[in-house]
Amino acid sequence: VSFLQSRLSGKRRPVAAAGVAFAVAAGTLVTAGPASAAEIYDVTTKPSGSYLSAAGSMNLATYGEHISTCDNSSDGAGVIGYWKVGSGGTVHSLYNGKGRATCEDVNASAPESSRIYLKVCLRNNGTVVSATCSAWESFPAGA
């Protein structure tokens, strides 16, 4: 699976807690509570001109509210992601200009009950390529 294929636009993927599986396999789990899991949500850039669909992506891992901006294409453009907590929250940006198959990461530190909004675009030579921008998408902060 290529780096680009591993990105799923607007999808969520469960990330199971490995400790529970290990304890069960080792026969040491006496009682079981709810399994802790995180969700990973993705938004991706749109195609425009020579830029491919999903050339850039922004990901939210709900356990710890980690946000990543990833470059999925060797097209020469960087990726800029925008995020905010709540629909009226302050807009923050996270730029990744390190090239294909790289990500930049930040901890959003949002309350579990809030919603995090994500938007991602390509940026070429300091200029945002607005035709590649995703729409704002909203995801729950807590797992």
Regions found by a protein language model. Give the residues of each.
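Post-signal peptide N-terminal regions of Sec-secreted extracellular proteins
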Residues: 36-143
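N-terminal prepro-regions of secreted/extracellular proteins
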Residues: 1-53
